[in-house]
Every structure is written in C-alpha cells, then in structure tokens.
Amino acid sequence: MKKTKLKFGVIGSGSWGTALIKILSENNDEINWYIRNKDNIDFITKNSHNPNYLSSVELKLKKIKISENINDVVGNSDVIIIAVPSEYVNKEMKKIEVDISDKIIMCALKGLVPETNLLFGEHMQKHYNVSIDNFLVIGGPCHAEEVALEKLSYLTIGSSNLSLCKLISAKFKCKYINVKASDDVI
C-alpha cells in the first residue's frame, strides 16, 4: 500500500463510531460517515453533535461527509471502519453492494459475527474476499467517553501486515491519542 492520503469511511454512529470520527478528524482531510437514520444526520449537520452518543463532542463537519447511503460511503473510502455492535454487523454488511475485496477493512467491533460464529476478519475473508493483508483491528485500552473528553488515551491497531498497520496507526495519533501498531490481530 503506497497511498498515504487515504479516505476513511466509518460505518456506525454509536459511542465508538462517534469517537473514531472525532479522532480521525484531527489528522485527516476527508472522512465519510454512514449513519442509517436521516433524523440523526439532519441533527448532526445542523448542530455538529451526535444527539444520541457523546453529545458533548463537537464534530469538525468541514472534514466529515455524512450519508445514509452505505454504498456511497464505502465506494468513496479506501479504509472502511466497521463500528457497529456485532449483533447488527451482518445486517449492515448485507447492504453493501459495491465490491470491497480491495478495500482496507478495520474491525472496531467486539465478539464474533453471530450468524457465522467467526471472527470478523475470518468472516470478511470468507464472505467478501477481503485479503488478510488488508484487514486490521482496533481496540483500547480506552473508552469512547475518554476520547470525547480528550483524555490521554491509548489505542492498539493490529494487522498481520505490519507496514499497513503502521501507516494506518499514524492516521489515528493526535495530541490525546497514542497508538501502538501490532502484528497480533486476535
């Protein structure tokens, strides 16, 4: 992966999705955000805040393109971050009609994919032909609420492709987030 100016797409608008949008807007010029509820999109667009999660966080809307069309978000992004509860991941993924086999996929969910009992990376390989070399996981030890308050926090990003992992990790580092790149995806 030689491209260093990457477009990120976040699928999910809960606490963790909102926190990731906040972090990404610190370092990146363009972030695409899929939110399935039009009323929430309208509120965020008008008020620069998510009405349901981390409502005190002011979002940098000049850097964020919000859409209720998951295919627009996925199609216009190089890196897709899946930040929905695992119980809904299959429902949201089935809405994707564009080919994602060449996209970089980042897992921000916890647990297994319920219908398949697979880890998300295994699920993406089996059902969407995503190469393990284009797959990453992101996790704490921080909480969305700490990110919202800009408390010094730590993230771990893992991938079997360590050079990709380091490239993506740099996109998350900011004054209140330290990032460790790891080759451990489990």
Q: Language-model features: where?
A:
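NAD(P)+-binding Rossmann beta1-loop-alpha1 motif at the extreme N-terminus of oxidoreductases
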Residues: M1-V57, K63-E68, V74
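Generic secondary-structure signature for well-ordered alpha-helical cores
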Residues: E26-D29, K46-H49, N129, S160, ...
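Short, hinge-like loop/turn segments at secondary-structure boundaries
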Residues: S48-Y53, H123-M124, L152-T156
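A short helix-to-beta-strand connector/capping loop
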Residues: V57-I66, V130-N134, K175-I177
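Rossmann-like NAD(P)(H) cofactor-binding subdomain of soluble oxidoreductases
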Residues: I70-G75, V79-L152, I168-S169
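Conserved Rossmann-fold dehydrogenase catalytic segment
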Residues: P141-A148, K175-I186
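Short helix-loop capping/hinge motifs at secondary-structure junctions, enriched
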Residues: L162-K166
